[in-house]
């Protein structure tokens, strides 16, 4: 079964001084041009997974139905665990 969503809510520790947020949004636009990307924040302190989780918890009540992409990366290229959650309702 294929799910089709119209929104991606986007939270990162990337900051906005460089091109990384823009690159992710360009890739999304290329893959799914119908999708609106909603920026929650990109100013989570670097590598601070707890701060990212707290920001997401505060925002989730306002996030529209769709996909939430949260990236707080403890180090590019390092061994780390990913989390994927599916919520219905």
Residue ranges and their predicted role:
Residues 1-89:
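Charge-biased, low-complexity intrinsically disordered regions
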């Amino acid at each position: 079964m294929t799910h089709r969503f119209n929104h991606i809510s986007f939270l990162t520790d990337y900051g906005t001084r460089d091109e990384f947020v823009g690159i992710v949004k360009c890739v999304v636009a290329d893959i799914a041009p119908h999708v609106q990307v909603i920026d929650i924040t990109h100013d989570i302190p670097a590598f601070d997974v707890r701060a990212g989780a707290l920001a997401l918890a505060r925002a989730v009540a306002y996030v529209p139905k769709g996909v939430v992409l949260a990236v707080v990366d403890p180090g590019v290229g390092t061994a780390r665990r990913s989390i994927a959650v599916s919520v219905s309702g």
